[in-house]
């Protein structure tokens, strides 16, 4: 069973699990739904509901739609980069279908990975894991896929972290260092903080490029604009925080910080856990749900995109993993015409935090220093930079959810439960953490639960 099927099965199991034992709510055909959050999860839920004739109102705390999807344009160069979600995977069927529906073009966004380690540069194809580990790793992935879901052996993976699992399976120190550098970019923190279940499932079920396949032409925010238009911009309320959600008399009332309130038959809350915990829930959330919210952490990621006066790297499909502070680089302007180009540094965890404390010039210096073993002195080509540190984002305090050991099969399932007439959605409940596809799936699943309730 793929992770997507696991989510659907778990969702079915808990869809009717109203976790308010002392309250009874009569069955109503929903006519109005309030959605908290106008990121891609909330917009996807709203779009599905509107297609079924349900009135929707989206309430968004930010001054824009899109949440963690944020395209930035260097206007004078007519070039774009992503400060948030970056990739559309070859396996991301729903997002690909939406792009087709809205007439959005997907462009190849695959790369060939160079390596800088110990100040030594190796081109793509000139480095790899040891043959012994490649063979062992493939057998581990195959074994995981052969296990029956829910079996004791498969569930055991959630008792270890990803780092420990590989150590226990004989990975060498050199291979382990490479895996840490590479895999931590997928999870946003060290692999010592990742459930082995989440870790091995990530790679056992991915496309050959680990879902780093496509990008939306013109920027990923294009899908946000299309969804918002389809839902109706008049149904989206920006710059408004939800303070309280109260369930009574068979309906739900949402109270906002501007004094306004909205009543509906159902609510879908798509906020990350940090913002969700700031809402006053009446009746209150159960203890197991609160415990799960407090357990789940989010990754610290900073993306720093530098506009260079020329594409000195020559290779349009360049990306590079390094053991330096800027960590991972990729060519943001692949398939964008122009002499100028953008390289983006993607740093995680402590690296991200340290970079976030630097001014823009210092960030540029660190990035150019990291690139020196491969390209020499390139600071002379750097014009300016833009960055976003998700670790201090006012509404998320992180980029995306990271499931540690003992959390993949426990915390996530708990957080997928509804709270009376309130349903929850978002990237943190999805099978593909950190991908737009997962957020869409989660939003649509919540909408389907309401439609079928």
Regions found by a protein language model. Name each.
Residues 2-453:
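FAD-dinucleotide binding site
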């Amino acid at each position: 069973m793929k992770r997507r099927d696991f989510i659907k099965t778990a969702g079915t199991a808990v869809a009717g699990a109203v976790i308010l034992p002392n309250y009874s709510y009569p069955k109503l055909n929903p006519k109005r739904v309030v959605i908290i959050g106008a990121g891609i999860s909330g917009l996807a839920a709203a779009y599905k509901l509107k297609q079924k004739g349900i009135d929707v109102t989206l309430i968004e705390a930010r001054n824009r739609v899109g949440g963690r999807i944020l395209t930035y344009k260097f206007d004078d160069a007519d070039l774009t980069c992503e400060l948030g979600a970056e990739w559309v995977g070859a396996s991301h069927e729903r997002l690909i279908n939406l792009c087709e529906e809205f007439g959005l073009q997907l462009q190849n966004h695959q790369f060939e990975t160079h390596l800088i380690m110990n100040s030594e540069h190796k081109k793509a194809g000139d480095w790899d894991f040891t043959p012994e580990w490649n063979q062992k790793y493939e057998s581990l992935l195959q074994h995981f896929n052969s296990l029956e879901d829910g079996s004791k052996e498969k569930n055991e993976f959630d008792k270890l972290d990803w780092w420990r699992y590989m150590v226990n399976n004989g990975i060498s120190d050199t291979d382990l260092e490479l895996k840490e550098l590479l895999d931590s970019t997928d999870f946003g923190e060290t692999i010592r903080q990742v459930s082995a279940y989440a870790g091995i499932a990530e790679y056992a079920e991915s496309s050959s490029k680990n879902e780093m396949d496509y990008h939306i032409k013109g920027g990923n925010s294009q899908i946000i604009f299309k969804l918002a238009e389809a839902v109706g911009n008049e149904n989206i309320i920006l710059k408004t925080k939800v303070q309280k959600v109260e369930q009574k008399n068979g309906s739900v009332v949402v109270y906002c910080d501007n004094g306004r309130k909205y009543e509906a038959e159902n609510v879908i809350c798509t906020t990350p856990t940090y913002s969700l915990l700031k809402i006053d829930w009446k009746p209150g959330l159960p203890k197991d749900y609160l415990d799960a919210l407090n357990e789940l952490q989010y990754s610290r990621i900073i993306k720093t995109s530098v506009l260079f006066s020329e594409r000195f790297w020559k290779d349009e499909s360049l990306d590079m993993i390094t053991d330096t502070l800027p960590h991972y680089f990729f060519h943001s302007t692949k398939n964008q015409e122009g002499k100028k180009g953008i390289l983006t540094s993607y740093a995680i965890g402590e690296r991200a935090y340290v970079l976030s404390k630097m001014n823009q010039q210092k960030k540029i210096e660190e990035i150019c220093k990291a690139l020196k073993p491969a390209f020499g002195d390139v600071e002379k080509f750097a014009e300016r930079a833009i960055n976003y540190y998700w670790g201090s984002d006012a509404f998320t305090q992180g980029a995306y959810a990271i499931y540690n050991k003992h959390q993949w099969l426990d915390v996530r399932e708990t957080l997928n439960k509804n709270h009376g007439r309130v349903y929850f959605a978002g990237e943190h409940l999805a099978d593909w953490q950190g991908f737009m596809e997962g957020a869409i799936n989660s939003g649509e699943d919540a909408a389907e639960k309401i439609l079928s309730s």
